[in-house]
Amino acid sequence: QLIDDEAYAQSAVRYCAARLMGRRGAVRELVRKGVDRGLAQHVCDEAEAEGVFSEAAWELGRRTARKTVGMDRDVRKRRFWSAGGRKGHNPDILRQIAQELFG
């Protein structure tokens, strides 16, 4: 039985978003799983247009904010930026979220 590559890629993108990954992280994960890079980028572009990765970044920010309550503001920001970078989020959206959540 042949697997529809695009359906698999879309399913994998939803999985990546549930793990709060960004676009870069999702493309990297799809390619690692054997999806063609062009298809991976196409599916991630569609998901990005739907706001999937933006919402994942906001959820990552909210979780980081909850976990770091009471810590120094710079420490909280650094932890958020580190997590966002590891998960492959766009620095522009990370900057916006950090500004709003951590001042």
Sequence positions of predicted segments:
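An alpha-helical, amphipathic repeat domain used for nucleic-acid recognition
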Residues: 1-103
